[in-house]
Amino acid sequence: MDDDFLFMTLLYDFYGALLTDKQREIFEMYYLNDYSLGEISELLDISRQGVYDTLKRAESSLEFFEEKLGLVKRHQEIMNKLDKIKKGIEIIRERERDPEILKIIEEIAREIEELNP
């Protein structure tokens, strides 16, 4: 899977509810269920060009929502920071010998895992 495909599905996770019903249906068939444009066209009884146009409008809408709201970018930044914190905790676990400090570190690690399963 390429990065554009994954990014588009991530945008859909955040903003899919903002698409029209038809855009959502075609997007899901294409991206999530791996149907071709021709297969979608046959199943929905619309032209292949109509499927293509609807899919492109859905993609443009998702990109527009991200440009204006930035939720995916913010989510990715948070996940990256959580990963850095986890790595730091692992280093501290390896070096720290004080049981009280280790207990606190374990509590912090559990809370981080709840944020980033």
Curated annotation (Swiss-Prot):
- What job does the chain carry out? Might take part in the signal recognition particle (SRP) pathway. This is inferred from the conservation of its genetic proximity to ftsY/ffh. May be a regulatory protein.
Spell out the Pfam families in the cross-references.
UPF0122
Return the protein name.
UPF0122 protein Teth39_1278
**Family indicated by similarity:** Belongs to the UPF0122 family.
**PANTHER family attached here?**
UPF0122 PROTEIN CBO2450/CLC_2298 (PTHR40083), UPF0122 PROTEIN YLXM (PTHR40083:SF1)
Gene3D superfamilies the UniProt entry points to: Winged helix-like DNA-binding domain superfamily/Winged helix DNA-binding domain (1.10.10.10)
